[in-house]
Amino acid sequence: MSALAVILVIGLSYLVGSVPTGYLIARHVKGIDIRGHGSGNIGATNVWRTLGPGWGLASLVGDTAKGIVAVLLGRAVGVPGLELLTGAAALTGHGWSVFLRFQGGKIIATSLGVLIMLPPVALATAAAVWIAVLALTRYVSLASIIAASSVPLAFALGGVGWRHVLFGLFLALVAVYKHRANIDRLLKGKESRFSFRK
């Protein structure tokens, strides 16, 4: 497989990740820019709070699908480990979308899609951590930060190889960076708690 094909599939994965699902849903449903409402994020949590649970779930499914597609693109090329690079490219696209002038979401739902396609130890660990932290605190942001941070450790303890550990570190670092405003609000006691009602 040529280097050009590898570069092209990584670029395509970035573009897939860049599709701003929540932004497009909000534009279509209410004609609004979701970045000007609620937390200002384009992700599923803010869509849920702004437009309601149904559209929030639609945003979650769409963003998760981007991660799945990116991994499948990487595997289709047949280069070992390429699915980790295409997965990382999708996360980068979601976080810094070319369609939104390199603004974007916080990568959690797209990370879910990527992890669904990788060895299950990280997904199982991150999901358990996310559910536990959300149940205890009702802070989606805190649950997401801690869950993302558990991914590299889960891969390391699961013995799946150094490439997966490096990918997990990338995922965790980007997730924490994208949640820096949430971290500031958490420290100040100003972060909003999640409710299953709009």
Swiss-Prot record:
Quote the pathway field: Lipid metabolism; phospholipid metabolism
Q: Where in the cell is it found?
A: Cell membrane
Q: Cite the entry's keywords alphabetically.
A: Cell membrane, Lipid biosynthesis, Lipid metabolism, Membrane, Phospholipid biosynthesis, Phospholipid metabolism, Transferase, Transmembrane, Transmembrane helix
**In Gene Ontology terms, what is a biological process of this protein?**
phospholipid biosynthetic process
Q: What class of enzyme is it?
A: transferase
Q: Does the keyword Lipid metabolism apply?
A: yes
Offer an example of a GO molecular function term for this protein: acyl-phosphate glycerol-3-phosphate acyltransferase activity
Reaction(s) catalysed by this chain, per the record, are: an acyl phosphate + sn-glycerol 3-phosphate = a 1-acyl-sn-glycero-3-phosphate + phosphate
Kindly state one GO CC term assigned in the UniProt record.
plasma membrane
InterPro entries membership: G3P_acylTferase_PlsY
Q: Tell me the superkingdom of the source.
A: Bacteria
UniProt membrane topology term: Multi-pass membrane protein
Per the UniProt entry, the Enzyme Commission number(s) are: 2.3.1.275
Q: Name one Pfam family in it.
A: G3P_acyltransf
Membrane-spanning parts? 5-25, 114-134, 154-176
The entry describes its oligomerization and partners as: Probably interacts with PlsX.
NCBIfam families in the record, alphabetically?
Answer: glycerol-3-phosphate 1-O-acyltransferase PlsY
Q: Which family does it belong to?
A: Belongs to the PlsY family.
Q: What does this protein do?
A: Catalyzes the transfer of an acyl group from acyl-phosphate (acyl-PO(4)) to glycerol-3-phosphate (G3P) to form lysophosphatidic acid (LPA). This enzyme utilizes acyl-phosphate as fatty acyl donor, but not acyl-CoA or acyl-ACP.
This chain belongs to the protein called Glycerol-3-phosphate acyltransferase
The primary gene name is: plsY
